[in-house]
């Protein structure tokens, strides 16, 4: 599966929730009027785009339609896609050109912070960079052990202290190890304690001073990990962390399991925070760099599938649809054949070792025929 296909599949629920609903609504109108805009704004708000961002999108759409003299409602989706694509543009690149560069990863418990670090380490290593991890979240129980598992999976070294240790000391030792091993990138886990913002700011401030002293002039990223499934709560978290830490980018996880992926729009529009990566699955390679155009294309792909097409393109569209159906049928047939082969092979495979495992435990063959009271009777005789 290609990168775009991964993003497209990961956004399926969000696409159905936002552009799918909007397409159905637009197709029910024969002209563009204020009622259409009101329904559009309502659908955007329901899609976790947020009130302010929904209003901004509708205002931009009114302006574009007026400037272009558009009167056909079926053309709205194309304009909407262009607006969203423009809104998503930003500094989406990861800036790690110095050696070493450092990435601090923050986020509340349960958003996929540790998993993101492991996947990011694996991705950077796959790009030819040498990576080292620092377990500086010494506050959360089991955080160090979980990061250790991901470090092993990614095949990168991990610097750790005991639970409750000074996070800044962990960062200091990780920097020292990175220098000694000539590593390209340092990724440090940090605690995300929003319930005590003062402690969080103090901790990050101390870590920042260590980095400034030990790695002056190095490239530094502070990535906030957010769970897309939390919808507007993710925006609130971003706002809180933004006031406590110098966030340089967002990692939006679990997009594949939620229809609330529209939350990326208010994060970028209202807070001005660029999205650097998105998580579209559970596999190691499902952490994808954020591509605004690919995201917009995947989000509005429903237009190509369901919205009306103009007459000149209908033949080409029908041919494309038939080809897609043929490929899907071939794929389904191949999967069915593979499943049939798998069903045939495991049965003898599982039956052969079964007697070997049971033989030592159930030596007397008639054991299955014994009455339930027999073991009790035998036990009394032995006593």
Give the role of each language-model region.
Residues 51-53, 140, 256, 284:
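Short hydrophobic/aromatic residue motifs in ordered secondary structure
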Residues 167-181, 195-304:
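Conserved catalytic-core segment of NTP-binding enzymes
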Residues 244, 248-360, 365-377, 381-383:
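C-terminal lobe/tail of nucleotide-utilizing enzymes
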